[in-house]
Amino acid sequence: MTASRWIVPLLIGLAACGAGVDPAGAQQARQMLNGFRAEQGLGPVTASEALEAAAMAHALDMMRGGFFDHRGSDGSDVMARVRRAGYGACAVAENIARGQGGLAEVMGDWVASPGHRANLAMPQVTDYGLVRAQGDIWVLVLGRDGC
């Protein structure tokens, strides 16, 4: 089953159980990401349901497990999580954050951090997924499928 066929039932199920993860302001996120990338002379990124699913899974894992790390509770890294979500990544990066109350704040913090900024400015990425979980846990996954 492709990510596009199971993402809607997943989102409905999460909403029903009060999981507290919602897509983070899709239009605003796209504008902010692509505005930053344009300032760097880079091409735009497009929202990906599969990358959003991978970001959501990690945000829920951290929220439920009470931890904050790029490694999942099962030892997974971002590449393993995006592949589980059906995305055949050849390039991938992940930014996580905690405590920022809004998209502008989290983006500002990522741009100000050299490592996070480098991820935002990866020239080879073409897609992204961004979610925010309860407790203001943010996960951004950037990738390129099928290089």
Each language-model region and where it sits:
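Extracytoplasmic/cell-surface-exposed regions of Actinobacterial cell-envelope-associated
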Residues: 39, 43, 67, 77, ...
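A short alpha-helix/helix-coil micro-patch that ends at or immediately precedes a cysteine
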Residues: 22-64
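N-terminal Sec signal peptide cleavage junction
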Residues: 17-19
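Bacterial N-terminal signal peptides that target proteins for export
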Residues: 1-8
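Disulfide-stabilized extracellular recognition modules
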Residues: 89, 97-147
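Short, surface-exposed glycine/acidic/tryptophan-bearing loops
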Residues: 52-102, 120
